[in-house]
Amino acid sequence: MKNPFAHLAEPLDAAQPGKRFFNLNKLEDSRYGRLPFSIRVLLEAAVRNCDEFLVKKNDIENILNWNVMQHKNIEVPFKPARVILQDFTGVPAVVDFAAMRDAVKKLGGNPEKINPVCPADLVIDHSIQVDFNRRADSLQKNQDLEFERNKERFEFLKWGSQAFCNMRIIPPGSGIIHQVNLEYLARVVFDQDGCYYPDSLVGTDSHTTMIDGLGVLGWGVGGIEAEAVMLGQPISMVLPQVIGYKLMGKPHPLVTSTDIVLTITKHLRQVGVVGKFVEFFGPGVAQLSIADRATIANMCPEYGATAAFFPVDEVSIAYLLQTGREEDKVKHIQKYLQAVGMFRDFNDTSQDPDFTQVVELDLKTVVPCCSGPKRPQDKVAVSEMKKDFESCLGAKQGFKGFQVAPDRHNDRKTFLYSNSEFTLAHGSVVIAAITSCTNTSNPSVMLGAGLLAKKAVEAGLSVKPYIKTSLSPGSGVVTYYLRESGVMPYLSQLGFDVVGYGCMTCIGNSGPLPEPVVEAITQGDLVAVGVLSGNRNFEGRVHPNTRANYLASPPLVIAYAIAGTVRIDFEKEPLGVNAQGRQVFLKDIWPTRDEIQAVERQHVIPGMFKEVYQKIETVNKSWNALAAPSEKLYAWNPKSTYIKSPPFFESLTLDLQPPKSIVDAYVLLNLGDSVTTDHISPAGNIARNSPAARYLTNRGLTPREFNSYGSRRGNDAIMARGTFANIRLLNKFLNKQAPQTVHLPSGETLDVFDAAERYQQAGLPLIVLAGKEYGSGSSRDWAAKGPFLLGIKAVLAESYERIHRSNLVGMGVIPLEYLPGETADSLGLTGRERYTINIPEDLKPRMTVQIKLDTGKTFQAVMRFDTDVELTYFHNGGILNYMIRKMAQ
């Protein structure tokens, strides 16, 4: 059907009549000018894609009427301009696409219909690990090992880039997905098929929101949802409320963008922004560079919002030119955004739109800080760090507690390393990593770290040799300007050599610690510390042996590495003593903002970005040499332990089955609050005594060849065994941290997978009980696929993180939510009952259903299918089944 809004299309430039745009001002609707800028992007996409089938005129009216409809839980469709994927989530997506082609063929359809219609970029950044550090050849050795471990995955991805249209792969060694997106992939405005429209995207990584800092609306979705978008489906979303976050004032000269984002993260967690957009405005925004804004937008998942949007302004335009974008294109970007009312002047209050609620932060109140020891929202001022850590030591086990007996607070353990004796204590730093796109995309904090390293070396300071130090930049541009500015040798001297271009320590690919260090930590039962410039510090994520992990700016990472402990008050205690016996304090070596800006102006230049990115797809010789099959259907290798055809579609037919009630289900796990997707489906190392390790050992692999769970996401047998395999999982059935549960019929304590397998063999359905914020953290589709394969039919929780809830829906697992004010405790649930959940045939969004226990007790819960589209997916047994049936008909 013809687009009913076709009359809004007009040329942007009289000289190019063939290039048009949808002029939303021609709607002649006064409501448009009051909409938040982020909502204007949703409106434009709806107007441009209106076909009265997937996108209806009524959807446009609902978005225009945002001021009223934001409170009505109304569903709207959104068709993003593109999709980005990283390899940990990209491999299972390509595996699903390959399996969907097989399924469509089996059902009599054309398998080549399974093809991305929406452009997709897949950046390989999650596979490299810090195996080598503190040596000049660390980068080469880590990259060689990455290829050795992942050759099969990389060959499969190369097959995918040839077998599917519209899919571009950025090879390993290029950088981190979100930084490459910011510096290179982002268009800001698309110029395609004779039409200008705003760049927008979804990504299979929760930190996709980083691009919001450049004025490109984007957020993380589950891999399952991203696959549907790639196949042309719109995302069905609840029209979000938009929190206006007003920034005022100017930051103190000693404050970094990291300090600002950690302050905002704590603030917005307290405000409560889950499921909402945050849009930044106010004169303080004009004080922030695009790198600063991107740092703030990057940590959006940590404060729980869907998106953290900074509209495009003059600073954004200057950034596009600085990063080597073509001048003519940048002119058209500005002209288009001005024509359509999406270009901002943050000092002009008349441009401030309506918001659901306004919260404010005066940037001059921000102080240097870290976050930890177990959550990104737990901000600690650097001046309070020593006191805070010491109070955490004795506090009850929890987010801010390790329950170490008072008489053990000063325990020490000596050990030999490289023929010298060293001592570890509670609070000793054993990992110090400058890592993550959150910070390595920001030249001011990276050059700040480099200048601090220079001053530290010149002052005679050093880092103890057993501390695992590393520098993993998000793109080659970082190395370029660190080298050109002359600070790289000083970073290397302190142990911060470049170890790889990828996520590395930030996602738990921190590699092994020296054996003597691990022995000292375990024998002394010490709370050892990791300090990283990342965005997440959940328990067990950074490294199994660092029970405390703090997020900090790159200069502070170096400072704590030099100090060797977090039990230091930088204002009163020296970092160290130089060869002359003089005490050196942090204030003596901290670079000024003027020093940093002078170096940045001189060395961060457009030519550098052009040089790095013009050869990004061809620079990796190992990638270029990979052979990949050319067939359109993938030839699965039954012996492969990396790539396996998943069982999701084996019994799929064209006929729909009515939904069945869940009868007499057992509880597999009884969990508490803030269970992350890391707890549900860890990405890190495969423990040697785990079900996944036994599977690999039975296939002839040695522990050295296990690789990580993240790298094995193309193999469902390993991922099912890795579900709930996090050593920090706290299950109320056991009252201890372990990847285990009680098999209720027998009373035996088993690994979670072994217990689930026993239930499945007996034909017994399973559910999971949980508390608040279930599924927070990474947008990990295996955190939904894994439970599905374990036979889990439903999860009953107090609340869900947005992406994980939609992933459960996408796999046909029911997300149930207690009624307001009710919890497992208030209802007296022990988890040892059997649960019957009545599922009516005439399901409606957010319907209340009855749950009956074998004790005779009944209560109600809300079925969190939030939209009609989600119900359609559930009736089909999941979103991919729905797509296959659609393509096969």
Curated annotation (Swiss-Prot):
List cofactor names only. [4Fe-4S] cluster
Q: What is its EC number?
A: 4.2.1.3
Report quaternary structure and partners: Interacts (when associated with the 4Fe-4S) with FBXL5. Interacts with frataxin(81-210).
**So where does [4Fe-4S] cluster get bound?**
437, 503, 506
Annotated function: Bifunctional iron sensor that switches between 2 activities depending on iron availability. Iron deprivation, promotes its mRNA binding activity through which it regulates the expression of genes involved in iron uptake, sequestration and utilization. Binds to iron-responsive elements (IRES) in the untranslated region of target mRNAs preventing for instance the translation of ferritin and aminolevulinic acid synthase and stabilizing the transferrin receptor mRNA.
Give UniProt keywords alphabetically: 4Fe-4S, Cytoplasm, Iron, Iron-sulfur, Lyase, Metal-binding, RNA-binding, Tricarboxylic acid cycle
- Binding residue positions for substrate: 86, 205-207, 536, 541, 699, 779-780
Give the cofactor note text: Binds 1 [4Fe-4S] cluster per subunit.
User: What are the record's GO terms for cellular component?
Assistant: cytoplasm; cytosol; endoplasmic reticulum; Golgi apparatus; mitochondrion
Q: Does the keyword Transmembrane apply?
A: no
State the organism of origin: Mus musculus (Mouse)
Q: What is this protein called?
A: Cytoplasmic aconitate hydratase
